[in-house]
């Protein structure tokens, strides 16, 4: 069986789109001329590229809105000053009125962030063990300054990258929510260092449910449409179907044939796309 796939590349992410091509009925027909086959393939390629562009735009918009939430907090002078107070005072001063006032300022900003309702939770943290979330939980959250919370923080690779710029946003592929231990919830994260007067004092992150990706990377406009995304390191970011296709033969600017482990042949289009 031959199928159509669109592989769109960016500096950070590879997104693979595929759909079973109805035009293969014509390819297998002795009545179809070579000219007709070529026209059908071009038509299907155009349709798939249009659908891929629509999906990529929706994904980019989703990440951009997450970025707006991050920037809104990081550009809030009161919020950043309060986080700096928490960072400066630390665990030993946790019971002071100054600490409590700073924490209340952070809570008010998190709970009243206009974009809060769009996402699973928005968090702020410092690496010495402070954590605060926009999502109120009565049970299941790790306790501030506890050994358990500090252990989680220091085990998360995306919080410990040494080569990250102070203004850089990092998109983290789907993972189990590390802060909520009552049950396993899969999320994906956009995070950024929190910088106050040129000094990094913590992190701000936006978490969204991984199930949202199925809505973003799906389409009802094309029967059999499926999508898979990989990050810059080739690790799976999202998959809506089992994919064993070997894309090594794919080339820019032309539609090529690739096969999976079952011997099924796919038509592949490889393109660049902007991301964030």
Which role fits each region the language model picked out?
Residues 102-113, 195-238:
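Solvent-exposed, extracytoplasmic
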Residues 81-83, 130-137, 234-240:
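Amphipathic coiled-coil signal-relay and dimerization helices
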Residues 196, 221-224, 232-233, 241-276:
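Extracellular/periplasmic juxtamembrane segments that couple receptor/chemosensory ectodomains to their
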Residues 7, 11-93:
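Juxtamembrane extracytoplasmic/periplasmic/luminal helical "stalk" adjacent to the first N-terminal
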Residues 75, 122-130, 226-237:
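Short hydrophobic alpha-helical segments used for membrane anchoring or interfacial signaling
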Residues 114-118, 124-207:
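Extracytoplasmic/periplasmic ligand-binding sensor regions of membrane-associated signaling proteins
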Residues 99-109, 150-157:
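Well-ordered, non-membrane alpha-helical segments in soluble/globular domains
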């Amino acid at each position: 069986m031959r199928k159509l796939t669109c592989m769109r590349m960016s500096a950070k992410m590879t997104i693979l789109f595929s759909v079973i091509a109805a035009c293969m009925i014509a390819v297998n027909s002795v009545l179809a001329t070579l000219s007709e086959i070529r026209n059908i393939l071009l038509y299907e390629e155009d349709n798939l590229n249009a659908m891929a562009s629509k999906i990529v735009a929706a994904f980019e918009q989703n990440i951009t809105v997450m970025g707006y939430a991050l920037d809104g907090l990081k550009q809030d002078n009161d919020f950043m000053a309060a986080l700096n107070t928490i960072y400066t005072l630390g665990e030993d001063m946790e019971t002071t009125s100054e600490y409590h006032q700073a924490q209340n300022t952070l809570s008010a900003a998190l709970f009243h962030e206009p974009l809060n309702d769009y996402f699973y939770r928005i968090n702020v943290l410092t690496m010495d063990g402070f954590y605060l979330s926009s999502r109120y939980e009565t049970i299941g959250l790790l306790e501030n300054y506890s050994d358990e919370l500090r252990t989680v923080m220091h085990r998360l690779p995306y919080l410990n990258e040494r080569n990250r710029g102070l203004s850089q946003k990092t998109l983290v592929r789907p993972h189990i929510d590390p802060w909520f231990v009552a049950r396993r919830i899969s999320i994906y994260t956009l995070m950024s260092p929190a910088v106050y007067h040129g000094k990094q004092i913590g992190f701000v992150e936006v978490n969204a449910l991984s199930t949202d990706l199925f809505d973003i990377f799906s389409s009802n406009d094309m029967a059999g449409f499926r999508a898979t995304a990989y990050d810059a390191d080739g690790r799976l970011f999202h998959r809506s179907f089992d994919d064993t296709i070997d894309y090594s033969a794919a080339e820019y600017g032309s539609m090529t044939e690739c096969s999976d482990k079952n011997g099924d042949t796919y038509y592949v289009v490889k393109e660049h796309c902007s991301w964030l």
